[in-house]
């Protein structure tokens, strides 16, 4: 805990520095207004705008407010400031490097998405941080250069001083000696001036301190109506402000923030005056504070004691900027801008869109001109804006006219984000990502595109030429959630997609999907004539929406998707409106291959009728792809359906279930028409998104589970590993009714393994009715990963801990590691469960969440388009959609119930430890102990995350789970004996006690009966961090996790299990003897008590003798403590133990702690003892006063000041109040 130290002539009581909790990575520095108060402090509402220093130039500011250059250098002071400055710059670099690594990780994780605009924004942030890092490194090198020059001048000055002293002390000699003396004196003066000049130059590189007033805290000293004046002096810089205490507990100040330029040789002087009348002012206190500790990367909340008793505290939020305001680089605020997740959240908020950039306007104009050149019709104005911060649909007026900036909606603070960001004006620019080479998405089209993946600014011709030669790579296949069609039209507007490539005739009907495992590349000619007419349709109606075609057999690996790919054999070469058909033969060795050829005949733009033809191949696994033969250049395209050799339609029922359950497939070649086939409603938008997203296929966590609504694309030939593996065209019992629609795309390697693994379910005939297939999907059981149905204990514990960490964010830098590990654990759990939707803690807005946000656009249209005959009364579609949309479809789990239970215990233990943080006053042992335990828990979570690859593999021994940093024989063997025939992650304490007694009971019982049980109970209590009940309790007993066992053993000094048992047995025997009722046994134990054996329990037993023992025992204990305290190791251990006793709930324990501190004469205990004299009960106050008298001159002086203050002021707290007020 860093504290704001004061000048040597003044001592501060409990001067505490906390990290500001207002820094959360969401709100920028200008957005952290008075609404975010300091812990439970009331809100400050200044009546007017804060008085900020005017924006002066650097020279005028330095001459007007800065400290003048010193005439005498102070190298010692400069060394201290330089060390603190380097520490602050290093922290700045580390914070920004961590942010850079997180952004790069987000880029890697998001590359399966089609949000290329979002990736581009991440890339801009990364480059901005890189520029700022280079600026920081240059700034640090400049400071190092100045310091090295200063050190050189210092050595020269010291040498000149030695020369002058040598000539001066000696007898005056010749003229040459006098000349040499004058030369040395002149050199000394020059070096002194050079050092002063370098000091001023270094002082100019210190940056700025931004001070924000948080308020006064004063217990009973602050009354309603009181007025205070605070005057701060820092060199020649001043800040004076006045405030008033309102009746509602609010404090109103006439000024809120200011900027101080750091100085090398000055201290910050703070004077607080209470204004009681026109000429009656009472000075509350005046202090001078050290400022070198304020060079920190993160904002800090400084709590300064104004008076000696600490009854008046001033709270300031101090933020250090390494650069001056006039010297700020453009990228200096890269980490301080709104976080990436916040920007994504505001993207999908219901706010007006941003004005499109010049690149977008040029793109829209180019598309419009291209359409007019082709058929003279205007391009649809209902295309969606591709701006990353725009709303989902834009009218033509909104797209081409300026719109007001949306208010950034700030979510809750995030655990994964590095804080201290500042806003940055978003701008559009060229995408410089990997996917920029292949703008077309995985299924070859993007009618629901969110980003402009590739826009050429050169000319329309260059853009068309570029689009004609682009090919699709594996990365583009892995990206891009792209719903099959648009939502229903709104108020007369008609759906019209924004194609990601520059061809307006890009295909919008083929929405068959593909996996990313062993991805067989499949391409599609975009500029087909009938698709152009679909894009240019202007009449609204359900019949205008092209219907997607899907094949849904269990392991059917077939689809013909469309992309712009020149070298692919399944490509239509387009010249103008002429289509050259190319026939390609698709051969597979798998059991089933479905070739789907969408047959669409468009007679006019107002009568677009989707009629997909579904074909099932025979077991010969050989079929010929359809030949696309354009009949005329008038945008009428007919497609010859492939020959069907198997009369059974495979999997069409499920497709109809997801889109329109009222139109079953009657024959393999029968075209199915659906007037509401594409009906995006608030409950079906996610479903449609998953049906057409290439990154939505079967969950990798369940082997043999295939994607129901989508199939991977088929290249020229596709070979399956096991051609004889049975396949089922409907969901097997292992399937979840909602899982195939919501599972994200796993890693390519995972999908490769999955695609080659056979399905364990037996082959069954395909259902021929969509309602039947949907009913089967709904009735399938939902497996629970935690072993129980709907067990959400792990998810609840994780959410509770992240919510608790949000309350302490920024106050304790030690918690950053824990927060990172908790966020990492959550991401691993969600990744394992196949969850890509956002949680409230991480706000990772994915495509599913985005489509859910857009579903409100089509609520009215869905109601208008729903015909009573289109949906049967008993249709279970609503239930299926609810199960699909439900964010709690599957609880988070590691796949191992025992590991889940162990994690739950650790997460709740962390939440309990967090409650011990943030206490007010000098009693901080419990807080320090809790922070130490939290650091250990962070290492435990890190070990669990590192173990994530083997979560589902049953561990047979503790050696497979944890590893000690040093060799500790016997410990893991003992744990394996405890968990024999049990899971190695958890063990009941009764089982540990029984195993310990069986192994060590015979040997320890020889020394004293029951010693083995006492040793094991002490071990368990130390490992668990809590006392065990002495009597059996109802309900499940306490359990010890392998990670608690491992973490505790790592802290021990004993090298082996045998040595630990022996040492602990000696300590337990000593404590028993000290607590004996026989005075002779107690005195004998005191005489023979070795220094090394007196640990926490032994020291507590000694201190209790100072309260409960007779005079002879008390004298012996005092003598023993004084003699043992001469050793530094024992003194430190005893000091920590006795200070910890001051925070115990038992009054007698606190009294014993006070008396023990007096025995060892610890000046470190003066401040806590003074605090107890003011706040605790009469018995504790009396013991504290007695101990203060024994703490030397300093303790006696503190006691005198305490008595004077208590005589002058009424009692602040009554007996037994034990104030634990927290800021």
From Swiss-Prot:
It holds the Pfam family PL48. InterPro entries: ARM-like, ARM-type_fold, FAM65_N, RIPOR3. Residues 565-592, 680-695 have a biased composition (Polar residues). Residues 89-114 form a coiled coil. One of its GO terms (biological process) is protein localization to Golgi apparatus. Keywords: Coiled coil, Cytoplasm, Golgi apparatus, Phosphoprotein. The modification Phosphoserine is found at residues 22, 349, 351, 456, 459, 874-875. It comes from the Eukaryota. Residues 375-411, 475-769, 856-889 are annotated as: Disordered. The keyword DNA damage does not apply. One of its GO terms (cellular component) is vesicle membrane. It is found in: Cytoplasm; Golgi apparatus. Gene3D superfamilies: Leucine-rich Repeat Variant. The modification Phosphothreonine is found at residue 355. SUPFAM superfamilies: ARM repeat. Residues 380-395, 505-523, 546-564, 601-650, 659-675 have a biased composition (Low complexity). One of its GO terms (molecular function) is 14-3-3 protein binding. The keyword Coiled coil applies. Belongs to the RIPOR family. Downstream effector protein for Rho-type small GTPases that plays a role in cell polarity and directional migration. Acts as an adapter protein, linking active Rho proteins to STK24 and STK26 kinases, and hence positively regulates Golgi reorientation in polarized cell migration upon Rho activation. Involved in the subcellular relocation of STK26 from the Golgi to cytoplasm punctae in a Rho- and PDCD10-dependent manner upon serum stimulation. Interacts (via N-terminus) with RHOA (GTP-bound form); this interaction links active RHOA to STK24 and STK26 kinases. Interacts with RHOB. Interacts with RHOC. Interacts (via C-terminus) with PDCD10; this interaction occurs in a Rho-independent manner. Interacts (via C-terminus) with STK24; this interaction occurs in a PDCD10-dependent and Rho-independent manner. Interacts (via C-terminus) with STK26; this interaction occurs in a PDCD10-dependent and Rho-independent manner. Interacts (via N-terminus) with 14-3-3 proteins; these interactions occur in a Rho-dependent manner. This is Rho family-interacting cell polarization regulator 1. The gene is RIPOR1.
